[in-house]
From Swiss-Prot:
It comes from the Bacteria. Keywords: Hydrolase, Lipid A biosynthesis, Lipid biosynthesis, Lipid metabolism, Metal-binding, Zinc. The gene is lpxC. Gene3D superfamilies: lpxc deacetylase, domain 1, lpxc deacetylase, domain 2. Pfam families: LpxC. The keyword Hydrolase applies. The lineage of its organism: Bacteria, Pseudomonadati, Pseudomonadota, Gammaproteobacteria, Alteromonadales. This is UDP-3-O-acyl-N-acetylglucosamine deacetylase. Zn(2+) binds at residues 79, 238, 242. Belongs to the LpxC family. Pathway: Glycolipid biosynthesis; lipid IV(A) biosynthesis; lipid IV(A) from (3R)-3-hydroxytetradecanoyl-[acyl-carrier-protein] and UDP-N-acetyl-alpha-D-glucosamine: step 2/6. Its cofactor is Zn(2+).
Length: 306
């Protein structure tokens, strides 16, 4: 049996909110089987829990935000969720003392480190995968995203930026997902932004925590970060990282091929909602044997069985 996973123990980190610029403390804690991922605002009295479900994503401008019926939000969840998806964590309670997840270094890598530091515990219940049975597609102008049947989880992603630095880089990546491929090739890709946009955002009290410490910053011609890029194709890889996080609000690891052109948070969420609304397009499956699983979430050394 392939089992569900949670973290072995609580782990804590402090960072800065991308938009507020304020200090944020994040705690990741174990959760029972079939809990899913639940986020909790501990700065509210009483604390407010918001389950990570596609229908709770009600804000997709500049980030992905979960918002409950009372309008209480937790923003910038996508990099943390990419790490949860990449390591195959099914169940966790995540507490945060602010309206946004800390931006850390602008990638998923610090969250991968946190989860690995907490340890990964296998639980006594079968892991469920969301298997795509037929194609589902959403479009917005020339942008589009699609999920279709595939034995593992493949990502086929293309961006199209006219900026000379991005245009010079590879803007099309096809990869077959595994935890090791995610950690090595995707997790360190940072969010990127243009100096002209950052100036506008700050004038509107946004991106107050943004800096070259947590983003790739470009002017009209080049990357301004003194250390340059982490990957030659960091731009498209960060868009893939965002998509991993955005798709994980489906509630399960996906078995299928995700193909996208110029998509962002809004279209990614539309795709998940469209998929879940068409119940003949997917099914939940479990696996008895490791050899039968078409996606590898390699269990790190030291994982224990509950």
């Amino acid at each position: 049996m392939i089992f569900q996973r949670t973290v072995q123990k609580m782990v804590k980190a402090t960072g800065v909110g991308l938009h507020s610029g304020n200090k944020v403390t994040l705690s990741i804690m174990p959760a029972p089987v079939n809990t899913g991922i639940v986020l909790v605002r501990t700065d509210m009295n009483p604390a407010v829990a918001i389950p990570a479900k596609a229908e709770q994503v009600r804000e997709t401008t500049m980030c992905t935000a979960l918002v409950n019926d009372e309008g209480i939000r937790i923003s910038t969840i996508e990099h943390l969720f990419a790490a949860l998806a990449g390591l195959g964590i099914d169940n966790a309670v995540i507490e945060v003392d602010a309206p946004e997840i800390p931006i850390m270094d602008g990638s998923a890598s610090p969250f991968v480190f946190l989860l690995q530091s907490a340890g990964i515990k296998e639980q006594a219940a079968p892991k469920k995968y969301l298997k795509i049975k037929r194609p589902v597609r959403v479009e917005d102008g020339d942008k589009w995203a699609e999920l279709k049947p595939f034995k593992g989880f493949r990502v086929n992603f293309k961006i199209d930026f006219a900026h000379p630095e991005i245009a010079r880089s590879q803007q099309h990546v096809v990869m077959d997902f595994s935890t090791s491929a995610f950690v090595k090739d995707i997790s360190r890709a940072r969010t990127f932004g243009f100096m002209r946009d950052i100036e506008y955002l700050r004038a509107n009290n946004l991106a107050l925590g943004g800096s070259m410490e947590n983003a790739v910053v470009l002017d009209e011609y080049r990357v301004l970060n003194p250390d340059g890029l982490r990957y030659e194709d960091e731009f498209v890889k960060h868009k893939i990282l965002d998509a991993f996080g955005d798709l994980y609000v489906a509630g399960h690891a996906i078995l299928g091929e995700f193909t996208a052109y110029k998509t962002g948070h809004a279209l990614n969420n539309q795709l998940v909602r469209a998929l879940l609304a068409q119940q003949d397009a997917w099914e939940l499956v479990s696996f008895e044997k490791e050899a039968d699983v078409p996606v590898s979430f390699t269990v790190p050394g030291g994982a224990v069985y509950a």
